[in-house]
Design a protein with these regions (language model features):
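A short beta-strand motif characteristic of beta-propeller blades
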Residues: 66-73, 130-138, 179-185, 220-227, ...
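Short, conserved, GDST-rich strand-edge loop motifs in beta-rich repeat architectures
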Residues: 42, 92-117, 160-164, 250-268, ...
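Beta-propeller domains
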Residues: 39-69, 91-135
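Repeated scaffold domains used in trafficking and secretory/extracellular systems
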Residues: 77-82, 140-149, 186-198, 230-239, ...
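Short loop/turn segments that connect beta-strands within beta-propeller blades
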Residues: 125-130, 173-178, 216-220, 275-279
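Secretory targeting and sorting signals
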Residues: 1-32
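Loop/turn-rich, solvent-exposed surfaces of beta-rich toroidal or solenoidal domains
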Residues: 230-283
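Short coil/turn segments that connect the beta-strands within blades of beta-propeller domains
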Residues: 87-89, 152-153, 198-200, 242-244, ...
Length: 339
């Protein structure tokens, strides 16, 4: 066989191998698209970023958190619930109360209070906090959005009745197009949700975060477990690689008799990291920084990021009619790496 022929055959073979690799890669990408997990940091061949899990594992009560910025929102925000960040937008969930719920003397029909009336909002802002769109969510008695999570493509939002042991709708909002898709309905009040990028499943927490549930994307419940932690009620959570969930929230505790007793409350704030495989609380720490209106900073919307050993926390504890209105507060801290 001539040298020129051999070279042509080798070139042709290499081209076929290259084309096969491209086709295989395209097929894999299309499969990712069908499963709804494209674009996530936990998919593909990239190693997930574990900075946040590693850093939070050394956060203590003595971690020196410093407030570094305060972003005032100049539109009606009502009662804020959850926050999430995409590349281009800030998303803030909130409930507008039209008629408050009223407790029954004794439970009626399985409920401890009236449903009340309200409007669920998902505010879409640019990174400067300017309102770009107000998305209304909910149906009938289900008008109360909760904690939200951004999975790299979509923002997941639960909208529940404003009472325990009720029902909720799980929404998916495309972060780029802002298209809204009603994913499924569930029994019970679910006031928070995260997307587990390792499994492609959703995990939600009920009223007071007393119970967690895991679903597939069609709403089939795959597992449920009780929360072993009683320090705080989780208000807003986020997925953390690998297979963890970071939550923050608040518990209202009675004051001392001299300070008003049960008629007054002390807001205990805090954060907790939960293992989504073992369901154990890996680490929980209190957080006692205060807003303009005097609320603990982790009262409602909360998200955290890490870069190396540097942590950044975003919170929005005040309602639109409190203090200086809703402000997104930024706290930052450096932590020592684990030994």
């Amino acid at each position: 066989m001539g040298t020129s022929i051999s070279r042509r055959l080798l070139t042709t073979g290499a081209t076929l191998v290259l084309l096969a690799g491209v086709v295989a890669g395209t097929t894999a990408a299309q499969a990712d698209g069908r499963s709804g997990t494209q674009g996530y940091s936990g998919s593909g061949h990239h190693a997930p970023d574990t900075d946040l899990a590693d850093d939070f594992n050394v956060v203590t009560r003595n971690t020196d958190w410093q407030q570094t910025s305060r972003l005032k929102l100049n539109f009606p925000t009502f009662h804020t619930e959850g926050i999430a960040y995409s590349q281009d937008h800030i998303f803030l969930s909130a409930v507008q109360i039209l008629e408050p719920t009223t407790k029954f003397p004794t439970p009626q029909g399985g409920y401890d209070r009236t449903p009340g009336k309200g409007i669920g909002h998902l505010f879409v802002m640019d990174k400067a906090g300017n309102l770009q769109k107000d998305i209304t969510l909910g149906e009938g008695d289900m008008y109360h959005p909760g904690g939200i999570d951004f999975d790299g493509t979509n923002v997941w939002v639960p909208v529940a009745q404003y009472r325990p042991d009720s029902s909720a709708i799980i929404y998916k909002v495309d972060a780029a197009t802002l298209d809204v898709h009603k994913q499924f309905e569930v029994k019970d009040h679910f006031g928070g949700i995260i997307f587990d990028k390792q499994t492609g499943h959703l995990v939600g927490n009920t009223w007071g975060s007393r119970r967690f549930a895991e679903w597939d994307l069609q709403g089939k419940e795959l597992s449920t477990w009780e929360n072993p932690n009683y320090f705080i009620d989780y208000q807003d959570c986020q997925y953390v690689p690998n297979a963890r969930m970071l939550c923050a929230g608040v518990t209202n505790l009675p004051q001392t008799p001299a300070a008003g007793g049960t008629a007054a409350t002390y807001e205990l704030g805090g954060m907790a990291m939960i293992d989504l495989t073992s369901h154990a609380v890996i680490r929980d720490v209190p957080f006692q920084k205060w807003s303009t209106a005097g609320h603990v900073a982790t009262r409602n919307p909360f998200k955290m990021t890490a870069a190396g050993s540097h942590l950044t926390m975003k919170v929005a504890p005040d309602n639109g009619d409190e203090g200086n209105g809703t402000e997104i507060l930024t706290y930052e801290a450096d932590v020592a790496p684990a030994k």
